[in-house]
Amino acid sequence: MQLYFIRHAQSTNNAYWIQQDADNDLRRSPDPELTDLGCQQIGVLAKFLRSGSPDGGQITSGNNGGFGITHIYCSLMVRAVETGAAAAAELGLLLTAWADLHEVGGIYEVIPETEERIGLPGPNRAYFEERFPSLRLPESLNDKGWWSRPFEKPDDAVPRAERILNVLQDRHGGTDDRVAVVSHGGFFKMFLCQILGAPQLRNGWISMANTAISRINFHADWFDVAYVNRTDFIPPQVYTL
């Protein structure tokens, strides 16, 4: 299995945080949309997945005719669905939503006076069916919002990362599948540490730019991290963190 972890395109929250002003929590959306720049980024990403080289400048396969993605998953957060939908459409694939791929914390609002984080329902099945009719949804998604639980503490994301890795291995391990997952920067740190068998980085970060790609190859009894945070295909004018 070749695994391609892709961070979503720029969201409105990402754009606000670049400004680093005192009103960020007030303007923050629990489930932000993509910005106009983010919409440009997804077009660049989709075309690169279709016709770019998956090798990251390495001389490995000599493949310059696209990534050959066979399966594509995304979280149920709107910014990830929008990103994944553009890629899936360009590749002629069915996009499958996977709730566990969500960002650390889940869907929540911040109470400015106390900085308390309160979990929210999130969009329900009808919302996704209307807005993203070709998205394959989990059977468990109903008329209630897909989140509908308290704020997820960072420590609670660790077993979720393990669960994602185990499911990917069960579904695609030992095959030639090329799997793309469209997810989030905070969760990527958790997920990569899980793959490496490394302690979680309590006071550290692993950068992934918007629409950056990280590739991990899984073999019969070993794996290799081919690259992390690949951004060479993103034009400077649309590059964002």
Question: What are the roles of these predicted feature ranges?
Answer:
Residues 1-3, 16, 21, 104-130, ...:
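Acidic, low-complexity terminal tails and accessory targeting/binding regions
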Residues 1-70, 85, 89-93, 220-241:
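An N-terminal RHG(E/S)-centered segment typical of histidine phosphatases
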Residues 2-6, 73, 177-183, 191:
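Beta-strand elements within well-structured catalytic alpha/beta cores of enzymes
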Residues 12, 16, 25-29, 33, ...:
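Phosphate-handling substructures
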Residues 43-136, 206:
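Phosphate-coordination/substrate-recognition cap region in phosphate-metabolizing enzymes
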Residues 86, 190-194:
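Active-site signature of alpha/beta-hydrolase-fold catalytic machinery across serine-
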